[in-house]
Amino acid sequence: MMMKFINIGYGNMVSAARIITIVSPDSAPIKRIIQDARESGKLVDATHGRRTRAVIIMDSDHVILSSVQPETVANRLYGSDDFSEEG
């Protein structure tokens, strides 16, 4: 079985099979999740000093910050044909 990796920006990759959710960092609950992950040592900052645009939560409780839009990460995960934003 081959493992699929998703590019989350600047050459950083995460395992597609381990992603639970991809969300925007703007809401207060997500900001609390980021702070809790920082305090517990489970925060991975992959932004290279740029603005955080997506927060990726992994099945290992790690929280990954990315400067790529959540929609872009989702399109890379599911392919542009399989993903459609409903709202």
Curated annotation (Swiss-Prot):
Coiled coil: none annotated. Belongs to the RemA family. PANTHER family: REGULATORY PROTEIN SSL2874-RELATED, REGULATORY PROTEIN TM_1690-RELATED. This is Putative regulatory protein GK1166. It comes from Geobacillus kaustophilus (strain HTA426).
